From Swiss-Prot:
GO BP annotations listed: glycine decarboxylation via glycine cleavage system; nucleoside metabolic process
Entries under Pfam families matching the protein: GDC-P (PF02347)
EC number: 1.4.4.2
Family: Belongs to the GcvP family. N-terminal subunit subfamily.
Keyword field: Oxidoreductase
Coiled coil: none
Catalyzed chemical reaction(s): N(6)-[(R)-lipoyl]-L-lysyl-[glycine-cleavage complex H protein] + glycine + H(+) = N(6)-[(R)-S(8)-aminomethyldihydrolipoyl]-L-lysyl-[glycine-cleavage complex H protein] + CO2
Gene3D superfamilies, A to Z: Aspartate Aminotransferase, domain 1 (3.90.1150.10), Type I PLP-dependent aspartate aminotransferase-like (Major domain) (3.40.640.10)
HAMAP family: GcvPA (MF_00712)
Binding partners and assembly: The glycine cleavage system is composed of four proteins: P, T, L and H. In this organism, the P 'protein' is a heterodimer of two subunits.
Biological source species: Phenylobacterium zucineum (strain HLK1)
Protein name: Probable glycine dehydrogenase (decarboxylating) subunit 1
Origin: domain of life: Bacteria
Length: 442
């Protein structure tokens, strides 16, 4: 986006056209006391003083890498190569704005085109868009897309879906008249989902690995949904799992959405993240967001442009499929760079390392006398604690161990106060796992 200066002459000309004597006249309807209220800011300070102040505030936090760290539950700590941050800080890329002018944004458009290709290959589906805000909003958009495709109103959310994804979907989709059937939290939710599908169902939303870490082959759910004319939406919160598990497309998914934070992006205090969205080609005109397409110019040279951008800034609001605006383009770039550095074999190896660390974690937890509830897992497990999981987390924190996420923090009303979610990635060491085991034994 280019900067357009506003000179005193320009300002005077505009004021003259509207008949205003000065800029203050534009705000005459605002009470004088409310125009420039005293804010009470601290006195100004130099750069060194500000740096000291902010460093002191930052020191109150505990960095994820400061000790043994086992938190996951939708946000995962992975190693991000220094190359990623170096490339995304190039001036050609350092923006989240939409590349509306293809003649000056070919680099950004090509990167997004490659991003779409990568997402389509990971999910096993035909077409992917140029990213969503995050995984949860992508989930909500997928449900509304299913409403448009099937012209039905009911969406069934599996009990294994991350509670925050379910809540976000309820918040957004209810405004479109959707009936959101949210099933109770369950470690193994496959049978309940299949039983709930009927002729009124627009879509079924399942997550694998689910919020409890359970890996599920959703092929049977796909068959049951399609038999009733419903769509299957598969959610993934840990994108590294694509390197080891069956893709959603292989299992019969019509739409796949995911959180892409695990690849190329840090934890970032919970955001910004990047949503992945893919579907079968026959549904592409109902897909939200933007797509980048490859074309040729008048001289036959290859180029990239925005295409099928059915959002309300581009077409009539009543015809739009979404209102996604300035979004996660920079995070999508980071995702694409990291994945390109890994390659297919590298992603597979990374996924296997994650699974191996999780197996080591499971063995340590069981050796400490706790029950592991997750039968099939990737890099995350659910553990039953002896008492409230939140109390155990606080106790272990005093020992310097960040021992996962109590499920009660995600869904306080689920009645699963004694369930703790633990995650291990390639950043987790054997010493970290030993420290957790020792802390649990005390």
């Amino acid at each position: 986006m280019r900067y357009l200066p506003l000179t005193p002459e320009d300002r005077a000309q505009m004021l003259g056209v509207i008949g205003a004597p000065d800029v203050d006249a534009l705000f005459a309807d605002v009470p004088a006391a409310a125009r420039n209220p005293a804010i009470g800011l601290a006195p100004h300070a130099g750069e060194l003083e500000v740096e000291r102040e902010l460093s002191g505030l930052a020191a109150l936090n505990r960095a994820a890498g400061a000790g043994p760290f086992f938190c996951g539950a939708g946000a995962y700590r992975h190693h991000v190569p220094a190359t990623v941050d170096h490339i995304i800080q190039r001036s050609e890329f350092l923006t989240s704005y939409t590349p509306y002018q293809p003649e000056i944004a070919q680099g950004t458009l090509q990167v997004l085109f490659e991003f779409q290709t990568q997402v389509a290959r990971l999910t096993g589906l035909d077409v992917a868009n140029a990213s969503m805000y995050d995984g949860s909003t992508a989930c909500a958009e997928a449900v509304m897309m299913a409403q448009r495709v099937t012209r039905r109103e009911k969406a069934i959310l599996s009990g294994g879906l991350h509670p925050h994804y379910a809540a976000t979907t309820q918040t957004i989709a209810h405004a479109e008249g959707m009936e959101i059937v949210r099933q109770p939290a369950a470690i193994d939710a496959e049978a309940a989902v299949i039983e709930a599908i009927d002729a009124e169902t627009a879509c079924v939303v399942v997550q694998t690995p689910n919020v409890f870490g359970v890996v599920t082959d959703v092929s049977k759910i796909a068959e049951a949904a399609h038999a009733k004319g419903a769509l299957l939406i598969v959610v993934t919160t840990e994108a590294v799992a694509y390197g080891l598990l069956k893709s959603p497309g292989e299992m019969g998914a019509d739409i796949a959405v995911a959180e892409g934070q695990s690849i190329g992006n840090a934890l970032n205090y919970g955001g910004p993240y990047v949503g992945l969205f893919a579907c079968r080609e026959k549904f592409v005109r109902n897909m939200p967001g933007r797509l980048c397409g490859e074309t040729v110019d008048a001289e036959g040279r290859r180029g990239y442009v925005l295409t099928l951008s059915t959002r309300e800034q581009h077409i009539r609001r009543e015809k739009a499929t979404s209102n996604i605006c300035t979004n996660s383009g920079l995070c999508a770039l980071a995702f694409s760079i990291h994945l390109s550095l890994l390659g297919g074999k590298g992603l597979s190896q990374l996924a296997r390392v994650n699974h191996a660390r999780a197996r080591e974690l499971k063995a340590a937890v069981e050796a400490a006398g706790l029950e592991v509830l997750t039968p099939r897992f990737f890099n995350e497990i659910a553990v039953r604690t002896k008492g409230p999981a939140a109390d155990l987390v606080e106790r272990l924190l005093a020992d310097g161990v960040v021992a996962g996420v109590p499920f009660s923090r995600l869904d306080p009303g689920a009645g699963l106060d004694d369930v703790l979610l633990l995650c291990a990635t390639e950043t987790t060491t054997s010493d970290d796992i030993a420290a957790l085991k020792d802390a649990l034994a005390r």
